[in-house]
Amino acid sequence: GDNKLLGSLKEAVQAIGLKDGMTISFHHSFREGDEIIGQVLETIRDLGIKHLRFAPSAVVNIKNSSIVDFVKDGTIDRIEASGIRGSLGDAVLTGLMDEPVILRTHGARPRAIEAGELEIDAAFIGASAADEYGNATGQIGPNACGSLGYSFIDAYCASKVVVVTDNLVEYPCCPASISQQYVDYVVKVDRIGDPEKIGKGAARMTKNPRDLMIAERAADVIAASRMFKENFSFQTGAGAISIACTNYLAERMEKRGVKASFALGGMTA
């Protein structure tokens, strides 16, 4: 394969031919610690590109750069996501957008992309480690964020794919969540995220007594079911109660000597 490393986000945006009205996507695994979305949008704004459809896997309460500002200045005029938190969510509720916002579940979003209902012109995939050929992961590095699963469909289906990392490693990057065959360009920036904030917000560990009570009762229900047996599988999440429930469930698994075949979800946590 070819070396795909470019010198800056500006070079990448120009190389992919991003134009007014196109659709861009991101993943939200860096959660409140994300510093990629702001950098990319600032680059796009500086190049005078406007009226973009902003289609991330979800929007959390991003603190470093307000998405609201990019809507107000016309850089973004449409939003499609799987959920919107924080200042952008508040602004949408109070009439920020002229076009209705489209929200899909985490399962419906990949289906819409695969079916062509949501066509991604450019996917910017943040990675905690990547090599110059485009192999990328979120599992290692100072800003590890877990699986890059939210970006799989973007990598497979987007017209252009740019991997953004602050941790360039020797080829081959391993384990690779995103394979080089799906990547057009790689950009190294100074910083992609704040590791102290990746586990904040919805992905925080909870100490709230009510949350813990709900989590423990949910674990009790699972443990009392006929499905709680050797090689069972379960789906969890990155939410505070889900994390606590998984912890309680682990205690019950150890006590009864039960092992799961696999667990799905909650990768960021």
Q: How should each PLM-predicted stretch be described?
A:
Residues 1-269:
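Conserved alpha/beta enzyme-core scaffold
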